[in-house]
Amino acid sequence: MEPRLKDLEKYLDIASNDVRMIGIKGMGGAGKTTLARAVFDRLSAHFEAKSFVENVREVSKASLSGWLSLQQQILSDLLNGQGNNVRGVHEGTNMLKTKLRGRKVMVILDDVDHQEQLEALAGDLNWFNPGSRIIITTRDEQVLIAHRVKWIHDVTLLSDEEAIGLFCKHAFGKDLPIQEYETESLQVIRYAAGLPLTIKVLGSFLCGKDKHEWIDALARLKRIPLKETLEKLELSYESLEDDYKEIFLDVACILKGWDKNKAIRMLESCGFQAITGLRVLGQRSLITFNYKYGFLYLSMHNHIEEMGKNIVRRLHPDEPNKHSRLWIQEEIEDVLASDLGSEATRCISLEVTPDIVFEGLGNMKKLRCLIVDISYDNLDVLVKIDEVSQYFPNALRYLKWSRYPHWCLPKTFQANNLVELDMSESRIKQLWSGGKVLKKLKSIRLCYSKLRTLDLGLTPNLVRLDLSYCNDLVELHVPVGCLKMLTYLNLCECKRLKSVSFIKDLESLEFLNVSGLHLKEFEDIILCHSNSNLQQLDFSENDIENLPSSIGNLHKLVNLSFSWCEKLKSLPGSICSLQHLRVLNLGFSGIEELPEDIGQLECLEELDLTRSNIKHLPDGICKLKHLKTLNLRGCKVCKLPEDVGQIDSLSKLDLTFSKIRDIPPSICKLKHLKELDLSECSELEKLPENLGDLENLNKLTVLYSKIRDVPSSICKLKHLKELELFECSELEKLPENLGDIESLNKLRVTCTKIRDVPSSICKLKHLKELELSKCFELEKLPENLGDLECLIRLRLKGLRKIRDVPSSICKLKHLCWKILMGRVRVNGLELNRVR
């Protein structure tokens, strides 16, 4: 609780004399009220008056006088009982406006779900005296946004360590589990997934029970979700509009883990306002978006997922054919094999197995979404799927079937309602055997398929077309004036395609990928799209030698790539006119120089020059005030501009395999730099003395360099999490105060001349991984290694002179992986190798 209180106290800043409203937002059961109560108990003594108003949502809805009773409580708490005389909400609002300005107060409004409640209880900052603090807890962030709450704190779920402590408090009355119940306790923690409500309920329920009862309870949870948790979470679902409820159920049952944009297209194909819907679900703490590998993915807590699936199943728990969504493989196989399908089913997500009978889809007349997948282990099953037995309901709006086994779609499938078709890696050679005009079809994805030809005159309203890596594709038939609405076209590596001249007429195009096509029409395409809506353009792996100056007319361009264009030596000066360009990829190209005026690309955020032929960076690059990522990996650049420190926004600098000999001191002015990679900089002999001024640096990698020392200023890097010093053959020592880098959680040192590891590293309380390898001259390890209380991985390899490992490592409770190579002793016990 203490770290959470400190995080919230930063927003409160009780020393400040302004009036503040602070929102605490999070999913049901996440501990919002507990946190608010802890802050209230700790800080309310600093205020002249205080009021903790619980259950605002419930009280507001309980009766017509609910709002009035809440106003009366606040006035009574803050004005010594004066609230009892208030006769109506309007009068209460006026009293709150006028009576509270004379006292510095703390007010907690717990579990608010409508802005109207805030209007009646804390309508404006000017209702309150300077120094006052109003804390609002809610599941719905939009309530806070609409009320213009400036400070919003998102409650995070408990870490494993916090969860164990809370559970043990309720189950055993102590901080650690009883040894006999340790395995079962960890199972509870995994099930709860950081949700305090579940942890408290299960801890109290299991308290005093024997081990057999614990095992039975845990087995039951796998089949039947915890009722108390579901009821609490379902309050957020019940408050949704009907269409948002449908979107939520689709995410819980089908779309969890999907790329956000793909999920939006699926939901939109089914008629939902997906962008708004997902935003609302996010604000209600029902879903989250996880950023990974450059994409946003839909995520949701396991218990919220359970809640959604329970809503779908509970009306007919033993009759899955009556469920609106089917996702359990065994139930789907049974429904289809028994021909029990019904009009109740709207969405199915299944995997092809020998037990799937697709004729069973025939009764699902209102099926809007069908998602079929197949694992590589079951590919032989595809051969057994009879083309004649294939049936797709004509109501389908979204059809996704990876590795579809037939050369075209079933003749019985009318597809008049189909909005999106996704059949990547399929055997499809043509979509339909006859000419069907599909006016509703907006998106086709057939990448990696066997497609040979495609008549796009049959899909006049197409918006997205992805045919990337269709190696057999030779012809696209595009009638004149067709595809007026196409915004996305991906023809990457369609090398047998005879002509792409139709691209010149695609007036709505925003995304174009023609990499690997070796185009002759390049200049015409650029010319025809001058002043168009084109935002992303990928001409990678083409035989381009010169770029036309007209490329500077693509004023809306945001992302531009000429990677692997080995014949391209330079860029025209007009490219510097692209005022909205954010990403420029010239990696593996033949580029030898950049325009002197490149600094005019004022919106540029990412510049990739990986393994290009660039030898010199123009000084103008230092004017790129919004540049965040500069990749010089494998470049021939020998030096950075002296004023590189002027690139204020730079957060990642990759100099791996570069010819850099020294780093200008100005680099230490990069206050936003988070990652600095100096791997394989074999000519580098020295690091800047003021490296410690990079106050936000969290990862530093130095590999195969000639550096002789690490500047002591590095110990000032309070946000550094990873420090890797590999094969620095001349490095003899580490800074004495290395232990001052409090945030460090990964330290890896493999340097042959290192003689001593400073004892201060034992102060690194957050260190999780420690590696000391090939330190041939190292004679001793710090005695207090056991003080590294968070250490999980310890790797000691090639330490020729080390014979004893300090016995203190036996104190490391979390150590789960260790490698001690050579002959070493722990507590006098000789070991050859421990893994």
Question: Residue ranges of each PLM-predicted region?
Answer:
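N-terminal flanking helix/linker immediately upstream of nucleotide/cofactor-binding cores
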Residues: 1-30, 34-43, 54-56, 66, ...
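A conserved switch/coupling segment of P-loop NTPase cores
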Residues: 41-48, 90-158, 362, 496, ...
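Non-catalytic, charged helical/coil tracts that couple and regulate nucleotide-powered enzyme cores
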Residues: 74-87, 130-132, 140-246, 274-276, ...
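Surface-exposed helical/coil interface segments that assemble multiprotein signaling complexes
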Residues: 99-101, 126-128, 178-179, 205-247, ...
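The feature encodes a structural signal of leucine-rich repeats
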Residues: 122, 357-358, 385-389, 406-412, ...
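Conserved hydrophobic beta-strand positions in leucine-rich repeat
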Residues: 348, 370, 399, 421-423, ...
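Conserved "Asn-ladder"/turn position within leucine-rich repeats
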Residues: 353, 375, 404, 426, ...
